[in-house]
Amino acid sequence: MPERKGIYFVSDVHLGLQVGDPAGREARFVAFLRSIPAEGTRALYLLGDIWDFWYEYRDVVPKGYVRVFGALTDLMDAGVKVYFFPGNHDVWAYGYFEELGMKILQQPYVTEIGGKTFCLGHGDGLGPVDRGYRILRGIFHNRFLQACFSTLHPWFAFSLGNGWSRRSRLGKRDRYVFKGAGEPLYKFCASFNDQRTASGEPPVDIFLFGHYHCPVDLPVGPSRLLLLNDWITQSDWLVFDATAGTIDRQVVGWDVPVL
């Protein structure tokens, strides 16, 4: 049996977003999942916003995505561990993903893979973000407000959720340009390493997030910051080889080594 040395990372697929070709995007994502060699793969990390709007009721989950869940469960049945980080669009998962066999993780999550220390997450809300966004994020994560939202009929609730998404920057197809050291996430990474150094721990080797919808590969002191692109116009994921210690970015079938 081949050694399980492959670790895959993907984010911001935004399944269900009514921009571009939603059915084609879902088909591309299913094809990606089916292309993962299960016998040689250790884990798949879903770094948030896989769904454009996901909200679970106690006894009801959103319809659709049957082939996506089928492909994910096939991987898990074959021994691949699947980890899910809630993003700002699919934060409202209350047990269905775990019922399927996924493990839910919260950012920032530090783990060692193949001798390298990773810090993982979706990337939203990390660092000194503006007050308005902190308030919005607090609303999304507030248990009382979530309980209130659950009293709405799903037709109305999903109409609100999908309408909010269409009015967002993503719905308008605005492209974000990452501003390097001036970004809150960059400052978070630098501060995170400072805290680790102060406590006698080594710095992180690789910070890996999504959320910003632009591919980034930047040094942060002794570390490397990698951001995944979204799936709106192309397919983008990263593959880490735990034996060789290398990580490659895969984009629409062709790969660019980044480490």
Regions found by a protein language model. Give the residues of each.
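Hydrophobic positions within alpha-helical membrane elements
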Residues: L17, W54, W92-A93, G127, ...
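Core catalytic region of metal-dependent phosphoesterases/phosphodiesterases
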Residues: P2-G6, V10, L15-I113
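Active-site-proximal loop/helix segment associated with metal-binding centers of metalloenzymes
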Residues: G123-S191
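A short, polar/proline- and glycine-enriched secondary-structure boundary/capping micro-motif
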Residues: G20, V129-G132, P257-L259
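N-terminal short leaders/motifs
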Residues: A38-E39, D52-L75, S168-V204
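Conserved beta-sheet core of the metallophosphoesterase superfamily
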Residues: L100-Q106, T117-C119, D124, P128-H141, ...
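A structural signal for the main folded, soluble domain(s) of proteins
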Residues: E3-G6, V252-L259
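Residue-level detector of flexible, active-site-proximal loop/helix-junction positions
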Residues: H14, H89, T111, G127, ...
